[in-house]
Amino acid sequence: MEHKVICVLAVVLMLAFGSLAQAQAQAQAQEETCIMAPRERINCGFPGVTAQQCTERGCCFDDSVRGFPWCFHPMAIENTQEEECPF
């Protein structure tokens, strides 16, 4: 009985760590898409938009640069398809 409990606990921990790793990877990917030159930003909000309202729209928020949109669409990441080697 004790071995079954340990096995179940091990499976639950592995699933939890897997979910956590996936969430961190998605968060990192989101951050990477928001990094761009201010002149490349395409407005996604409205005057006076808050960071929370902006992120709820699925957009990026950065109010550190005046004169450019603070709430803006994330940069699209191009999916690079794997090429098969002709070997």
Swiss-Prot record:
It is found in: Secreted. Strong expression found in normal gastric mucosa. Not detected in the small or large intestine nor in normal mammary gland. Its main location: secreted. Disulfide bonds join 34-60, 44-59, 54-71. CDD domains: Trefoil (cd00111). GO terms for biological process: cell differentiation; cell population proliferation; negative regulation of cell population proliferation; response to wounding. Residues 32-75 form the P-type domain. PROSITE patterns: P_TREFOIL_1, P_TREFOIL_2. SUPFAM superfamilies: Trefoil. Keywords: Disulfide bond, Growth factor, Pyrrolidone carboxylic acid, Secreted, Signal. Pfam families: Trefoil. The keyword Secreted applies. The keyword Methyltransferase does not apply. One of its GO terms (cellular component) is cytoplasm. The modification Pyrrolidone carboxylic acid is found at residue 22. One of its GO terms (molecular function) is growth factor activity. It comes from the Eukaryota. Residues 1-21 form the signal peptide. InterPro entries: P_trefoil_chordata (IPR017994), P_trefoil_CS (IPR017957), P_trefoil_dom (IPR000519), P_trefoil_dom_sf (IPR044913). Stabilizer of the mucous gel overlying the gastrointestinal mucosa that provides a physical barrier against various noxious agents. This is Trefoil factor 1.
